[in-house]
Amino acid sequence: EFDPRRDTLWLTGDLVARGPGSLEVLRYVKSLGDTVRLVLGNHDLHLLAVFAGISRNKPKDRLKPLLEAPDADELLNWLRRQPLLQVDEEKKLVMAHAGITPQWDLETAQQCARDVEAVLSSDSYPFFLDAMYGDMPNHWSNELSGLARLRFISNAFTRMRYCFPNGQLDMYSKEAPEDAPAPLKPWFAIPGPVSNAYSIAFGHWASLEGRGTPEGIYALDTGCCWGGELTCLRWEDKQYFTQPSNRQKSLDEGEAVAS
């Protein structure tokens, strides 16, 4: 059991739009203060775009109670100041919602995270969110600049699943690895500077069902919003704890969309 007096809770992102309780989740996580370390996911960024008037609210995301709550401004301004990347040097542990592209070393990943975090926490955040949607560019270069650079960074941290062997992102395939078209590989199957030196925890990829990753790579999305389980990893002894979803496997397709 999580005890905020002695434990630190790491959350892999997508705090919202994964069930009916987005408002309650944000209020609870915010109340935990320094006892929680989280990263933003793609659904969190989409919520911020809705909040900024850039994207429309989809009824299937069930965000209306949150958007109409009296403390919505406080919660969402808090949310947009949360990080894309968590690093614990003592544990040699890195966490990002979708993972870490093999094209980056840790210093690059940290700088890239800071670039997007700085924009999100500024008054100009709507300009970034307006340009966030899109799949290109899909290959990292230090020469990338402006909104194209920020779009690649947010895609890599929050949407990535597959890469080409050269590390180029594929933003289309979502199936389990055994069904993926050649030559695509899961990002974690391509050796990179970060995965060679750190453990990596990530969410986002429900069809993995927590399986098939190399040693030191922890896939924690086990499809709770699709009728699977909510999975927690206790770091000290690497023991997993699961909570069955209270939703049926035969979900109405209109209720939630993984992306």
UniProtKB/Swiss-Prot annotation:
Q: Which SUPFAM superfamilies match?
A: Metallo-dependent phosphatases
User: What CDD domains does the annotation carry?
Assistant: MPP_ApaH
Q: What is its EC number?
A: 3.6.1.41
What catalytic reaction does the record list?
P(1),P(4)-bis(5'-adenosyl) tetraphosphate + H2O = 2 ADP + 2 H(+)
Drop me one GO molecular function for this one.
Answer: bis(5'-nucleosyl)-tetraphosphatase (symmetrical) activity
The record's listing under HAMAP family reads:
ApaH
Similarity field: Belongs to the Ap4A hydrolase family.
Query: What is the annotated role of this protein in its UniProt record?
Result: Hydrolyzes diadenosine 5',5'''-P1,P4-tetraphosphate to yield ADP.
- What name appears for this protein in its UniProt entry? Bis(5'-nucleosyl)-tetraphosphatase, symmetrical
| Source species | Klebsiella aerogenes
This protein's encoding gene = apaH
